[in-house]
UniProtKB/Swiss-Prot annotation:
DNA-binding region(s) in UniProt: 277-310
HAMAP family: HTH_type_WhiA
NCBIfam families, sorted: DNA_bind_WhiA (TIGR00647)
PANTHER family: CELL DIVISION PROTEIN WHIA-RELATED (PTHR37307:SF1)
Organism: Lactobacillus delbrueckii subsp. bulgaricus (strain ATCC BAA-365 / Lb-18)
The gene coding this protein: whiA
Protein name per Swiss-Prot or TrEMBL: Probable cell division protein WhiA
UniProt similarity note: Belongs to the WhiA family.
Coiled coil, from the record: none
UniProt GO BP: cell division; regulation of sporulation
InterPro entries in the cross-refs: Homing_endonucl, Sporu_reg_WhiA_N_dom, Sporulation_regulator_WhiA, Sporulation_regulator_WhiA_C, WhiA_LAGLIDADG_dom
Amino acid sequence: MASYASEVKKELTSIEVHPEHAKAELAAFLRMNAVLSRHDGQMSLDIVTENPAIARRIFSLIKTAYGFEPQLIVTRKMKLKKNHQYLVRVAQMVSEIMADLEIYSPKKGFITGVPDKIKYSEQRSMSYLRGGFLASGSVNNPETSRYHLEIYCTYANHSQDLQEIMNKYFDLNAKVTARRSGSIVYLKEAEKIGDFLHVVGAVNAMLAFEDLRIMRDMRNSVNRLVNCDTANLRKTAGAAAKQVEDIELIDQKQGLESLPEKLASLARFRLQHPELSLKELAEQVPDGPISKSGVNHRLKKLHEIAENLR
């Protein structure tokens, strides 16, 4: 069964984009996942994934953005022998693509942050975030886990740039923390996670997330109410048991007939109906109905009499 995060990514890989947005998405993919290699004396950019939908996405983005098809190599993992690995290899226009996507320049070397032309464009930022999430993002199932979405980055300045984009344009309240020789930018609020899914284009996943979140919140509310009702019932039952104990002591020591009529009437009624709440006693007592405070006053009198007899 596919994980919730896998379903989100599957939806994202089906989105059709303009060549400029394909470049923005591809810039995130290559910056975060690509390895610069040399094969047969020729430079190449290699991206490895176990997700076939993501491999197809990278293939499609390169074709859309640069007009050629990269190599797609499928291998089987040696240890598990059941999972395939997909290698997307860009073996042409490598220098041009790296320069165009501002991943490398002769003057600056490798560029680890988000390029300005993306960082200062809300539309390109949306595509870049989509690429970043597909490259190294994850999101918990809202039905079974705590709310959490994250994107892992090797470089701290890259995660800080992603945080800036998320908060500046989309008010996502993203935070950054160090993690395993890198850092993550993450979201913890359910509403903000739903907003992020909408921003990157996972509309169906966002709607499913909201449905699951609402159901979970409703279940939590019902559980709180049930727990509250249970606690109130226990409290009522405990108070009633003490009242019955007081009345039985009075009956044993001096008899209920020795009490003033109003106290005796309530005492007999409480013995007959130990399950009733204070409100129900006030409504149903034979000489009533009376107020809850009136019932409470009489019960306190009975308690004082019982304490004097102990």
